[in-house]
Amino acid sequence: MAKKPDNPNYKVIAENRRARFDYAIESDLEVGIILEGSEVKSLRQGQSNIAESYAEVKEGELWLVNSYIAPYVQAKTFGHEEKRRRKMLVSRKELSKLWNATQREGMTLVPIVMYFNHKGLVKLKIGIAKGKKAQDKRETSAKRDWNRQKARLLKQNG
């Protein structure tokens, strides 16, 4: 069963469900993101997708690349680009940690979940991850199935 958030104001906007399947996530980090007004209004309607996006450190800044935020219908004249690079807010110490992590072979920055925090600000949880091979994916799937089967047996017998 999914864990309930500690704060009732915590609202998930978009979730990258493939991230945990395709990548072995070593650690995660909460970052802010710079958005335009029409993007925030579109996110409040839940119209976004981060499944195909990734993060990159470029020229001393952290960027979210290839994320989709649907256009806000009421802001047609002053709307926003649907897929554009969006700057993320992170401290210098965390930025250097992320840059060092991505310099290791096979490591990448993957967005895990986008949400509104208790103050109503859009936050993004990104993970430092390493891509899984097909065999690793099968092992993860087998472990998950075995844990479900164990839970079923314990529920029936206990």
Curated annotation (Swiss-Prot):
<dbReference type="GO" id="GO:0070929">
    <property type="term" value="P:trans-translation"/>
</dbReference>
<feature type="region of interest" description="Disordered">
    <location>
        <begin position="133"/>
        <end position="158"/>
    </location>
</feature>
<keyword id="KW-0963">Cytoplasm</keyword>
<comment type="similarity">
    <text>Belongs to the SmpB family.</text>
</comment>
<dbReference type="GO" id="GO:0005829">
    <property type="term" value="C:cytosol"/>
</dbReference>
<keyword id="KW-0694">RNA-binding</keyword>
<feature type="compositionally biased region" description="Basic residues">
    <location>
        <begin position="149"/>
        <end position="158"/>
    </location>
</feature>
<dbReference type="InterPro" id="IPR023620">
    <property type="entry name" value="SmpB"/>
</dbReference>
<feature type="compositionally biased region" description="Basic and acidic residues">
    <location>
        <begin position="133"/>
        <end position="148"/>
    </location>
</feature>
<dbReference type="Pfam" id="PF01668">
    <property type="entry name" value="SmpB"/>
</dbReference>
<dbReference type="InterPro" id="IPR000037">
    <property type="entry name" value="SsrA-bd_prot"/>
</dbReference>
<dbReference type="GO" id="GO:0003723">
    <property type="term" value="F:RNA binding"/>
</dbReference>
<protein>
    <recommendedName>
        <fullName>SsrA-binding protein</fullName>
    </recommendedName>
</protein>
<comment type="function">
    <text>Required for rescue of stalled ribosomes mediated by trans-translation. Binds to transfer-messenger RNA (tmRNA), required for stable association of tmRNA with ribosomes. tmRNA and SmpB together mimic tRNA shape, replacing the anticodon stem-loop with SmpB. tmRNA is encoded by the ssrA gene; the 2 termini fold to resemble tRNA(Ala) and it encodes a 'tag peptide', a short internal open reading frame. During trans-translation Ala-aminoacylated tmRNA acts like a tRNA, entering the A-site of stalled ribosomes, displacing the stalled mRNA.</text>
</comment>
